[in-house]
UniProtKB/Swiss-Prot annotation:
Region of interest (Disordered), residue spans: 390-423
Protein name per its UniProtKB record: Uncharacterized protein UU162
Superkingdom, natural source: Bacteria
Gene3D superfamilies, sorted: 6-Phosphogluconate Dehydrogenase, domain 3 (1.20.5.320)
Amino acid sequence: MNNRLLLSVEEYLSLFPLIVRNENLEDNQLQLERKKQALTTFILRAQSMIDDCVASNGGAGFIYSWFDDLKTTDYQKTKFKEAIATLTNYLWLQGHFIDKDYTSAIGDGLSLSFKSENADFEKKRLDIINKLRVCGLYKKSKFANFNDDGIYVNYDELKINAINNVHEELRDHYISKNNPVVNNNFDLNHHNINNVSSINASGNLATLNGFILNDCTLPNDLTTDKSNKVYDNAIANYVDIHDVKNLAWYGQNNNNAITRQELYEYCNKINSKMYWDAIYDYKAGELVYDLDEKTNTIKVYKALVNNGVSTHNIVDPSKQINENVWELINIQQIDLNKIKEGVQDAVDNKVNEVKKAIDTKENTFTKNLENKVNEAKQAVLSSYEQDKASGVFKGEKGEPGIQGPIGPKGETGPKGEKGDSANVDALTSNLESFKNTALNRNVRFPWKIMDNLNKII
């Protein structure tokens, strides 16, 4: 049994707002309480399953050998990864983030790191994780094969209740393109998880800590015996259970428990693909707390033997405690109303503490940032003034301006007097001689001068 399910009496009392079934509540309130219980129980079990599958010691050995076994088909491996994805997707939809690739421990697998390329979503996701850290919900990974600071969620029902308001702000983002598990069709609309009493001997489906992933149907043995009542540990809770007959919490209200056939029909009715059995294997010495709502008492039982799947029920069909299996060690009278009020106060206080801690950190960061910005501004201004005084910013001489437009044409001058014919002929002769002399000496004139000479001559 996972240690996170072993609670002291005080801790158990603190959880009553999540598990109490008060039929005097309004329908919507009753629905909310049942959903809370279903969520809490499922998360605990799902986290335990994931932990067991990737732990580097203990009972995880069969996972490694199972993946390496040549008899294990690709189909089985795929189903196993789909089961991991389905579990993780459910946690994601409830706002609980697993920030590590858990399947890295078993080789080629599915990434469960929900980082997003969408900057706005990623900022909110990291903000939620930081708030979870402040609440104490995150801590460093216990797995030896993770050599970095990988973290995993330590699920505590009271704290989950305390942070309901925190992850509410991401509600619109849960089912979106930013959720890789939803996008690869491993979501709740495609698969369901069914419990089997032992590892599937035929090996036709992948197993996950006693669970198998089946294709949207319940095994036949869950539907044939209509007289078989579903007791507390045979079926604890599942999603959207609010309009089903009352299910018990550790053995109460068994007369109202639904049959397997009724459960099967109900799942079909609401098109729900998520179904699971909360069968726990108790070890000798472990404690179980039984809430009796009719008498407002808590009964504490101690397991006397290591219980296998065939003896897991605290209450047998005759409603008599098996004294060879369980020992009643304590009965405590309780006031559910006071407990509920007290826990709500504790939740409110915890939320306020978290908000205060976050606000303090944010205010400190903002103030430090403003100081840094002001220092940078002052340094730039000071440097500018110094450079300005030293003439660094004195401009060089500019380029000449553009030439103005050409002025109007002047008036025609008076006609010149007629020259001496002899003088003109002499001038022409001299110019011709000058030209010929220049050409003979290979003197190069600009083409305009030569042109003028030719015109004159």
